[in-house]
Regions:
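Pre-recognition alpha-helix immediately N-terminal to the DNA-recognition helix
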Residues: 13-18, 29, 96
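Short, cationic-aromatic polyanion-contact patches
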Residues: 5-11, 62-81
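Short helix-to-turn junction characteristic of helix-turn-helix DNA-binding domains
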Residues: 19-23
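Short, hydrophobic-biased segments on the C-terminal half of alpha helices
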Residues: 45-49
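Short beta-strand "wing" residues that participate in macromolecule-binding interfaces
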Residues: 58-59
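Short acidic, hydrophobic short linear motifs in intrinsically disordered regions
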Residues: 24-34
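Amphipathic alpha-helical dimerization/coiled-coil segments
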Residues: 80-121
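Glycine-centered, phosphate/nucleic-acid-interacting loop/turn motifs that mediate DNA/RNA or nucleotide
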Residues: 55
Length: 123
């Protein structure tokens, strides 16, 4: 499947976050890295297989064990996801998004200054 059009569920994203951090791992490694309450082994195993079908992870087989690793970078997924949010909720306008964040989430002056500096450095 094409990861460009796929979104991750909350559970899938949690497992991808772990795999991005670990770079690779068996189901037990993923479980060990999970915060409590941990999902069941079979649940994690099912989710990584779904991620594989979606094209987000691949595995290396060692007998009956599978070591999973991400096929997409965290930054790449984040960029696609945020572009989708920007287009779906803010009409593609970064200004509208920042305005929403400043009113709804109370962006601080120092955070606004950081954004301005980032924009100035892009020129």
């Amino acid at each position: 499947m094409n990861t460009k059009t796929q979104e991750l569920t909350r559970a899938e994203l949690e497992i991808m976050q772990i795999l991005w951090r670990l770079e690779k791992g068996f189901v037990n490694d993923i479980l060990e890295a999970m915060p409590a309450p941990k999902l069941a082994y079979n649940t994690v195993s099912t989710i990584v297989r779904i991620l594989e079908k979606k094209g987000f992870v691949e595995h290396r087989a060692y007998g009956k064990s599978h070591e999973y690793y991400p096929l997409i970078l965290r930054e790449e997924y984040t960029s696609r996801f945020m572009t989708g949010v920007l287009n779906s909720f803010f009409g593609g306008s970064i200004g509208n998004m920042v305005s929403f964040l400043s009113h709804d989430k109370g962006i601080t002056v120092s955070e606004a200054d950081e954004i301005i500096k980032m924009l100035q450095n892009k020129k």
